Amino acid sequence: RAYIGIHIADINQELAKKLALNGVEGVLITDVLKDGAAKKAGIESYDVLISINDVEVNSVSQLHEQIIKFSPGDEIICQIKRNGILQTIEIELES
C-alpha cells in the first residue's frame, strides 16, 4: 500500500478563517511525518494539498481515494498552497 507520510484534515469555513486561507479548497496538512515521503519532498505542516496528478482533493476521503490507486515507488505530482502561493511538488510514495 502506498504511503505519503502526512496527517490531514478537512478544511471548513472556521478553519479557513482561522488560518487566513482563501476558501475551503484542498485538505490541510496538519503534520508531516519525520523521514516520510512528503517530508523528503519538502512538504510542510500547514501546507494545503490541492490536487494529486491534476485530480482535485477537497476532503480526507478524496485524498485516500487517490492514494490507493498508487503503489510504493510511484511518483505523484502534488499541487500545494503555501502562504497563498501555489507550488508543484513531486513525491515518491513509500510503503
Language model region names:
Residues 1-95:
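C-terminal recognition in membrane/secretory proteostasis and scaffolding
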